[in-house]
């Protein structure tokens, strides 16, 4: 049986570990880097598999983390980018259909993991460009020695709250 619970609450470093503890698979559908790092770190610390995804305009990406089987989000991206280094979804815009495409791929990753079939995107970053209709599957190296959360000598032992700007309802508009 599958049970989906939703929560209308702010998630931060003080409550995320308790929130995810009882779940078999976590899906990251957040719209900002600090939240993505928070989810990654909590999932690594709690040994929880999860699917990361991100979209902006006509592009999307996703990867799946399974404890002990491949790199985590922080292995690949290290730290949140400096403020204003990357446009927010409010600034750049998000095409609603992209959420459907990438979200469906995340749902498929969860289903495959939960029923134990197929190949997951563990160790890979899948990118999609809707303008060219091209997918690319990029092999990711695992930074086992230097990753601050899943490496040989982790320095992050608890989730971290980073300053973040959340996109508003008007994020999909182009002015």
PLM regions with names:
Residues 1-175:
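Adenine nucleotide-associated cytosolic modules
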């Amino acid at each position: 049986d599958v049970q989906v619970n939703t929560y209308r609450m702010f998630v931060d470093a003080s409550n995320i570990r308790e929130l995810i503890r009882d779940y078999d698979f976590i899906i990251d559908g957040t719209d900002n880097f600090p939240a993505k790092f928070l989810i990654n770190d909590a999932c690594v610390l709690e040994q929880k598999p999860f699917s990361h995804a991100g979209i902006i305009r006509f592009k999307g990406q996703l990867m799946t983390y399974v404890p002990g089987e491949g790199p985590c989000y922080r292995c690949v991206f290290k730290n949140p980018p400096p403020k204003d280094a990357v446009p927010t979804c409010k600034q750049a815009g998000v095409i609603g259909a992209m959420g459907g495409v990438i979200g469906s791929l995340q749902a498929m990753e969860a289903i495959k993991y939960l029923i134990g079939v197929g190949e997951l995107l563990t160790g890979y970053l899948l990118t999609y460009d809707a303008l060219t209709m091209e997918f690319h599957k990029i092999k990711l190296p695992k930074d086992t020695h230097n990753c601050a959360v899943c490496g040989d000598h982790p320095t992050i032992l608890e989730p971290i709250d980073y300053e973040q700007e959340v996109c508003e309802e008007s994020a999909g508009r182009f002015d």
